[in-house]
Amino acid sequence: MGNKRFRSDNNAGKPTSVEATRIWATKVIEDFRASGNEVYTFEHNLSNNERGVIHQMCRKMGIQSKSSGRGEQRRLSIFKSRHKNGNKNEANEKSNKEKLKCVSFPPGADVILQELFTHYPPCDGDTAATSFTKYSGNKGKQGQWKDDFFRKPQISSEEILEKVASLSSRLKKDKALKEITKLRSKLPITSFKDAITSAVESNQVILISGETGCGKTTQVPQYLLDHMWSSKRETCKIVCTQPRRISAMSVSERISCERGESIGENIGYKVRLQSKGGRHSSVVFCTNGILLRVLVGKGSVSSVSDITHIIVDEIHERDCYSDFMLAIIRDLLPSNPHLRLILMSATLDAERFSGYFGGCPVVRVPGFTYPVRTLYLEDVLSILKSGGDNHLSSTNLSISDHKLDLTDEDKLALDEAIILAWTNDEFDALLDLVSSRGSHEIYNYQHQSTWLTPLMVFAGKGRISDVCMLLSFGADWSLKSKDGMTALELAEAENQLEAAQIIREHADNSQSNSQQGQQLLDKYMATINPEQVDVSLIQQLMRKICGDSEDGAILVFLPGWDDINKTRQRLLENPFFADSAKFDIICLHSMVPAGEQKKVFNRPPPGCRKIVLATNIAESAVTIDDVVYVIDSGRMKEKSYDPYNNVSTLQSSWVSKANAKQRQGRAGRCQPGICYHLYSRLRAASMPDFKVPEIKRMPVEELCLQVKILDPNCKTNDFLQKLLDPPVDQSIANALSILQDIGALTPQEELTELGEKFGHLPVHPLISKMLFFAVLVNCLDPALTLACAADYKEPFTMPMSPVERQKAAAAKLELASLCGGDSDHLAVVAAFECWKNAKGRGLSAEFCSQYFVSPSAMKMLDQMRSQLESELKRHGIIPNDISSCSQNSRDPGILRAVLAVGLYPMVGRLCPAFGNNRRTIVETASGAKVRVHSLSNNFNLSSKKYDESLLVFDEITRGDGGMHIRNCTVARDLPLLLISTEIAVAPTGSSDSDDSNEEEEDDEEVAANTNEEVAANTNEEGMDIHKEESRRGAKMMSSPENSVKLVVDRWLPFRTTALEVAQMYILRERLMASILFKVTHPREHLPPHLGASMHAIAGILSYDGHAGLSCPPESMVPKHSRTEMYDTGGWEEKPNSFLNSLFWSLSLKENKHPSHTNRNQQHNYNMAPTEAASIPRQQNYKQRNPKATNNTDSGKKKEKMFVNPTNRINQPEAASTGKPSKHKSANSSGSSNKKENMPSDQAYGNKQHNTVPREAAAPMAKNQSSKKTKTRSGNNSDSGKKKEQYIPKRQREDKAEQK
């Protein structure tokens, strides 16, 4: 399969023009990517320019390309990721040659580990709790949350009659309601009211297809409610879903207004964080995600028992939730005959949805917009070349490309009018249809029997003025009748010579204009990159529009923020547009503050023209009612997902025909308008009909987990194949792999207890695991912020001017420095913390303005945090009093570890900088080199001389400029060693190991060629290999001081000792056991040995975090508790006093540094009160080192859980004075001075990287703990003799000095 080549017939029809070549090559590459082949080779008839174009397109699409051969034999081949399967082996080979980075526990951790393993030594029972537990299905059913919002109202028939009478009375008496009712009656959907209610009564599923503005969204729910109340006198629960929360809220408010009610009475809504109404509301609007959680959370039996109607609006948007929801509802319909499903769409894709539901009836409702003239790139170039000609003359404006869907009645009327005109010379009816309802569909309509068109009739009858009118309207003279005659031939046959001459001249001019336009197009395409927006062309076109007209807003559709900003800057640099009194330039983008966005709805004063620069948000989400001119770049930035390379993509791509139609319609809302498409007619014809459904361009981990929660016995792939457009198999495989890595699914794809808990939290499964970890290490508060920020938009605003943008970047750096710097994620944590404290002081507006923070985003994060906190309390994961759950929220090591858990496995290694290149390059697990985005705080990270530091990041995004990561954070090595999927050990690089590697590779090659021989000797040779691996592994781990290579997830190599590998392995096992215990017993305290282990892990992470801050910023230690002044040289951003006062306000109240929290105050919820004594604290700190001090404002000495590494002392090998643990093995002290080899029959991992076995790790960790605590005793059976405690020399000296 790997070398299989893909051939197609596409080369045979290779076009010659530049534009056609791009379209053809795109089709070939997309077909290849969708195929199962690895290589595709183009034919030899490609020019150098064509090969260059294909190379460029391949880079953008994540496909490798290579040209080979010379002359006529030169070929271009394209490949799918060739290094995909080999990258980890390549990384291993590379690590053998390079100097390994050393990783070890931080100074001070030895004392913590000694105490832990002394009282809770490793044993086989530690790892028993880490095995996956299959979800039984009982706990979830018992703990289901009942939401009355979606239950049917409890009202009697008499009460229904009262509601109907009250509504009728309001509509008759209230003047405002009378006016509203009058407007409602003029909506196109009004005449379809009876047809809709009748179809709903007769069919379980119907589809309403109506153009934007026909009234379906606001009127259909009212039609159904009135029908149930007035005609049937029955209660109902009508649930209407919208893809966006703002739509759900605004539509429900509009309907309440139309009925003269307050929102929340009979009409309500429920969106994330907000709701109005309740069970008493008969109509409820919600987002698709809300209804999906209802369907999944309650189970198929009870989820729709009280719902009578489900209206799914805007199904043409194809968001993943709606597609997934429709698949669930389709399965529920047969067992719920009372349920009615109403689908509503604004596009022509109705047939697919109708077929998906067994051919359900379709009600088509026409819309109303003014005619819109459509021009393409050829026309725009000709207009700009023509110079002084006014392209907006009244004649040209009347030309319309407005697409009209002809009904059967329209066709019948046209047939009759054509026959009357041709046979009886009665032209009034035909002229009336042509002039009053002008569109290309009418101008070029062909009689169903004779195929005659209106132009043929007028030409054959010699009506010269009517022929000229139709030709000016764009009627097609080349259409043929059933006899095979065109309008020109028909005029000549009827001896209408003047009409024939007019048509002939028009045809010649059209051909000449067409040739001229094509020449202009070819010349233009040869000089620009069509994949990018031509800002200069947009500026010239806008100047032409403004010169030929005096009023009318201009709406420009652009792909993204960069293009919006470039266009705005270009316009402001032009003196013609720089006058703010004449032009009001407004940007419409999610990064623009809400106050600025609202200006788009205001009409400008007389003499001022409004120019709106927008993304596709202006296609349907908002309506700007004074737009007359639309400039469509034809491009849009859409987030997608490449499952083959496992990267997200955010690229500028061509829109679909449906998108282009929506953009065109924006020009005809208030009066006839013009749409300028800045792409050719050929490109327009090649566009897809509809955009790719979201479920095909996103990772599907959450959906796969929801499938298993919905039906634990169902195969994920089997259910997802029921969707209208299932995700590709590779996406599903990637999702299942991640869910298995984090323990949500077993290797057999069974739902685990951990996965069941993850699935019921309203965050991504990876974020759920982070929350559990944060609770265990008492770092909940920042974890809540990180979890909610990952599910919401960027909280920082992007100013327009370059100077302000530099200030915004500096502000973000300053915020990040509060948490240690080198992070985009921690900048959000700091921003929220400062905003929350500023809000309490009444300074939130000042803070948001000074640090370019979006107030609305902060408010939303605050609400999302509250909701997530409530969910965690409801599931018992955190207590009602969470004051003790965030005591380590300011500790840099623990905070970054929490972040690493939430972002794993998105880990990269920083590449060293070369020469003068200051850009940060990161190597990922796949071997790819990606850049850090220019908007990231870590854009210039390489200049800080980091030595192969690790970064964790949200996602890899492939954009127009290549692959990059946007939000990332520098991470320490130790947290990733604790949370990674796999760690494996091998001897450090030597000639022997290299030779053995080569031999193994040769063996693998021989095995590949002689499968039958190997199969015959599998048993005997397998036993020999197993023994050899065991012998080598035992030798490698036989001594604690042995240097070994530690490989994380088969690609990140480190150098460490055998002892530290063993200790790390035990900590990993106990960490996973703690998480699983917390999942299965959320309201119980951790067992003593797990609670002690989490204490140890938190302490080690704290030490590790401080060890990584060799020159910490001033903000890391507040002034009121600073024990010494640090040299902050080298830190680029220092928080000012205003920011420091906001961030450290909590610490000011407590008068202590967060990392100095007393150890026995930690984990009050996760551990029993007596557990705090199970690990002896680092007592008598000054006794161990009389030079150490701990100064505070109060002057009191405090015991520390975590010692500040910058004030670190040499730790003695102190013996613990705590009581022996019941977990301690009987022979741990008696044989502690023996070196205990690993079992010789232990099986290891692959040939090069031996996975650390618990049988090896446990004895080594246990022996080392017992070595450091020796007891000189006589016969253990002699209980009458007192044991003498061995005290190291340094500790004896300390005690003597104290005396």
Swiss-Prot record:
Motif Bipartite nuclear localization signal: chain residues: 1182-1200, 1267-1283
EC number: 3.6.4.13, 3.6.4.12
Region (Disordered): 987-1039, 1175-1299
Alphabetic keyword roster: ATP-binding, Helicase, Hydrolase, Nucleotide-binding, Nucleus, RNA-binding
Domain R3H intervals: 15-82
Domain Helicase ATP-binding, first and last residues per copy: 197-366
GO cellular component annotations of the record: nucleus
Motif DEIH box, residue numbers: 313-316
UniProt feature, compositional bias: Low complexity: 1007-1020
Free-text tissue specificity from the UniProt record: Specifically expressed in the tapetum and vascular tissues.
A Pfam entry, by short name: HA2_C
PROSITE patterns in the record: HELICASE_ATP_BIND_1, HELICASE_CTER, R3H
Binding site for ATP: G210, E211, T212, G213, C214, G215, K216, T217
Acidic residues: bias regions: 992-1006
Principal subcellular localisation of the protein: nucleus
Domain of life the protein comes from: Eukaryota
Protein's recorded name: DExH-box ATP-dependent RNA helicase DExH6
Basic and acidic residues bias spans: 1023-1032, 1279-1299
Ranges of biased composition (kind: Polar residues): 1176-1193, 1204-1214, 1239-1251
Family named by the database record: Belongs to the DExH box helicase family.
Residue span, Helicase C-terminal domain: 537-711
Subcellular location: Nucleus
Reaction(s) catalysed by this chain's protein: ATP + H2O = ADP + phosphate + H(+)
